[in-house]
């Protein structure tokens, strides 16, 4: 057995700062299979902890927090340090970002405004006592996690990928069991027009009662905007063509596919039971390279909208029969404002 960090974890580790948390006594409660976890815990910088498979006998008065682990996983050497530090700030429920897949190529970034029922979370002693009382003495780790998620009063998200699940990410990792689910598909998360405009959809969907998850290739600038707006973000380099992650869409109540580049995903969902909004921003130039992936006809579940007449005409150049509505994003009309004239000659040197 060995531990290997994902590319994201290695990148983050180089920037992490050590915090002395050795006075905080923690339990790691993992009643199920925990071979990989046990190996990873050997390398923890925070040493004042104990791995247990039975909770009640180990809950002494000195225990300040318990890491609830419902399945085998690996963690970075700094994981318990970060969890202990979060407890010191007054948090009663602490979660973190995570890597998924054998090589950790899928990354999950959580938002404090959207916390699904986690498979692993740190719970303060005070919250744990309340949760165990509500669980009526049953120390089922999944039940404790479910109740802790619902009863937490001061939830804290650590913006570090401290955990690594060797399996692939699934819908239960990003959505709660009984919430309305919205999945946003974006072929890029850069600071360019389409992704930036897309962030405006997140608060709108949240106001309609949706839990929002964004799927994109990598953090290229706009990822923090989606997190701040209240969405969880899943990144994978081949997200546009990875059918396993499209499986998230089949468990969603609504899918927003951003730009024509998501044609392959729309084609897969075409005619299914999942409502799809295909939002077009694209000009003519890209269509010769993507036209062969665009469905010939669209099922009743797919609705196409564009940001204006140019984007509409671009799609009609290859699919003239598509019905396309207008969904215009609102931006300030700076052309109507009065700006003082700028004369570059004023700044030329006398020399």
Language-model features, listed with the residues they occupy:
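Conserved donor NDP-sugar-binding/catalytic core segment of glycosyltransferases
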Residues: 78-105
């Amino acid at each position: 057995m060995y531990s290997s960090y994902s590319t994201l974890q290695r990148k983050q580790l180089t920037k992490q700062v050590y915090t002395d948390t050795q006075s905080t006594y923690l339990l790691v409660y993992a009643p199920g299979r925990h071979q990989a976890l046990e190996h990873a815990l050997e390398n923890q910088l925070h040493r004042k902890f104990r791995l247990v498979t039975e909770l009640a006998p180990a809950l002494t008065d000195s225990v300040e927090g318990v890491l609830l682990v419902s399945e085998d996983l690996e963690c970075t050497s700094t994981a318990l340090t970060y969890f202990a530090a979060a407890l010191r700030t007054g948090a009663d429920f602490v979660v973190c970002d995570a890597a998924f897949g054998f090589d950790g190529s899928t990354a999950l970034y959580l938002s404090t405004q959207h916390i699904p029922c986690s498979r692993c979370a740190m719970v303060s002693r005070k919250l744990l006592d309340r949760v165990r009382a509500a669980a009526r003495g049953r120390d089922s780790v999944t039940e404790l996690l479910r109740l802790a998620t619902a009863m937490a009063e001061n939830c804290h998200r650590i913006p570090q990928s401290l955990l690594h699940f060797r399996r692939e990410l699934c819908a239960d990792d990003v959505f709660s069991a009984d919430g309305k689910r919205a999945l946003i598909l974006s072929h890029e998360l850069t600071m360019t027009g389409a992704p930036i405009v897309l962030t405006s959809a997140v608060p709108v969907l949240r106001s309609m009662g949706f839990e929002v998850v964004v799927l994109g290739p990598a953090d290229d600038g706009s990822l923090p905007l989606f997190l701040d707006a209240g969405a969880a973000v899943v990144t994978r380099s081949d997200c546009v063509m990875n059918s396993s992650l499209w499986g998230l869409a089949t468990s969603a109540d609504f899918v927003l596919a951003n730009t024509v580049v998501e044609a392959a995903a729309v084609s897969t969902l075409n005619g299914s039971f999942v409502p799809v909004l295909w939002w077009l921003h694209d000009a003519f130039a890209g269509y010769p390279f993507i036209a062969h992936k665009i469905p010939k006809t669209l099922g009743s579940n797919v609705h196409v909208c564009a940001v204006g007449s140019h984007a509409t005409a671009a799609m009609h150049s290859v699919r003239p029969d598509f019905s396309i509505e207008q969904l215009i994003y609102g931006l300030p009309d700076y052309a109507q404002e009065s700006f003082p004239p700028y004369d570059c000659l004023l700044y030329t040197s006398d020399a």
